[in-house]
Amino acid sequence: MPTIQQLVRKGRTPKVTKTKAPALKANPQQRGVCTRVYTTTPKKPNSALRKVARVKLSNGTEVTAYIPGEGHNLQEHSMVLVRGGRVKDLPGVRYKIVRGALDTQAVKNRKQARSRYGAKMEKK
């Protein structure tokens, strides 16, 4: 427990929280270009072929981003919008690609949770 005089001299330093998406440089999203689109396998209890893309962001950093939803139209040189948000069973994947923005198409035939996948309302 510091004395009042010690607090007057030094003061208390606030805890610095480390950002979970450092490549975005404190922005909500960042634009980037796909350099490689491929599939990876998840960590131990799960089994699948997860679709990921290596993206070079407009600020110069290169990140691995997950492509959510069923099916995608991404290939090399596609312009994508990247947001934060990790994929728990893919080590090193701390970003997600925004569906329905720039060159990324929305998920087709999506009925629920449409806004997450850029899907428009189905016409009756």
Swiss-Prot record:
Cellular component aspect of the GO annotation: small ribosomal subunit
GO molecular function terms listed in the Swiss-Prot or TrEMBL record: rRNA binding; structural constituent of ribosome; tRNA binding
UniProt-listed InterPro entries: NA-bd_OB-fold, Ribosomal_uS12, Ribosomal_uS12_bac
UniProt cross-references to PROSITE patterns, sorted A to Z: RIBOSOMAL_S12
A GO biological process held by the record: translation
Ribosomal protein in keyword set: yes
Biased composition (Basic residues): 9-18
Keywords: Ribonucleoprotein, Ribosomal protein, RNA-binding, rRNA-binding, tRNA-binding
Keyword RNA-binding part of the UniProt annotation: yes
Region (Disordered): 1-30
Similarity comment: family membership: Belongs to the universal ribosomal protein uS12 family.
HAMAP family: Ribosomal_uS12_B
Function: With S4 and S5 plays an important role in translational accuracy.
Description of how the protein assembles with itself and partners: Part of the 30S ribosomal subunit. Contacts proteins S8 and S17. May interact with IF1 in the 30S initiation complex.
Protein name (Swiss-Prot/TrEMBL): Small ribosomal subunit protein uS12
